[in-house]
């Protein structure tokens, strides 16, 4: 609610429609500067020639004299759970849960990723077995945000219209509440790690995806 992560990158539609040109120019001059930008070049190319082009086109841009202040807003501890119900016309029901998690650089982040893979894996994960195999849900997934500051782990369960969303939500919440009491086999953990390592290997074979991911981590 307080941290800027909760705000749209370029503002809401209403912001864009109402903002004045002088404010846009001021924002551009302050933030669109060499010390606040990253250039990623990916693919098969001549390194020396690429660097010469970078120097030619970006080198003349002067170093800014202003200094950017680091963000100081810290999301305060959450006082209890928050629930939001969104009603729309459609042919599927969704349950979404988010739990606070540490930032990407935290020592516990990798362990959290492995745990997430273990419990959401198709078809061996405990959530898959309890929700999809029992026909309460048609599918589910989970992921963690990879951020500089603390973020959240997200779970989504898809529930057919002829099934009870309340029952599926109860099973989901109950299972996640019991995760800290569960024990997992070495085989499950190894499989989870291998899946995560394979995703990194696949990423390294896709030039565009790798470049985009690098900018995400740098940012």
PLM regions: where:
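M16 family metallopeptidases and their MPP-like homologs
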Residues: 1-14, 36-42, 93-103, 129-219
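Conserved, carboxylate-rich catalytic/transport cores that coordinate ions
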Residues: 28
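An aromatic/glycine/proline-enriched structural segment found at the starts
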Residues: 38-103, 203-204
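Short, conserved charged micro-motifs
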Residues: 47-51, 107, 163-167
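Short amphipathic alpha-helical signal-transduction/dimerization elements
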Residues: 58, 119-123, 173-181
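Active/ligand-binding-proximal structured segments within catalytic/core domains
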Residues: 97, 107-119, 126-129
């Amino acid at each position: 609610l307080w941290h800027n992560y909760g705000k749209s990158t370029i503002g809401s539609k209403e912001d864009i429609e109402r903002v004045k040109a002088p404010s846009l120019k001021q924002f551009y001059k302050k933030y669109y500067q060499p010390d606040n930008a990253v250039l990623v070049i990916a693919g098969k190319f001549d390194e020396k020639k690429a660097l010469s082009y970078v120097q030619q086109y970006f080198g003349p841009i002067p170093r800014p004299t202003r200094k950017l202040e680091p963000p100081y807003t810290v999301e305060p501890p959450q006082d209890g759970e928050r629930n939001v119900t969104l009603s729309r016309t459609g042919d599927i029901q969704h349950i979404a849960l988010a739990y606070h998690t540490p930032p990407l650089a935290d020592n516990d982040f990798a362990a959290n990723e492995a745990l997430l893979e273990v419990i959401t894996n198709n078809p061996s994960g405990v959530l898959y077995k309890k929700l999809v195999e029992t026909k309460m849900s048609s599918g589910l997934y989970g992921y963690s945000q990879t951020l500089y500051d603390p973020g959240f782990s997200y779970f989504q369960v898809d529930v057919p219209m002829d099934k009870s969303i309340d029952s599926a939500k109860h099973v989901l919440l109950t299972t996640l509440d019991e995760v800290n009491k569960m024990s997992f086999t070495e085989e499950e953990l190894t499989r989870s790690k291998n899946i995560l390592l394979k995703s990194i290997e696949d990423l390294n074979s896709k030039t565009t995806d790798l470049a985009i991911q690098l900018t995400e981590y740098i940012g």
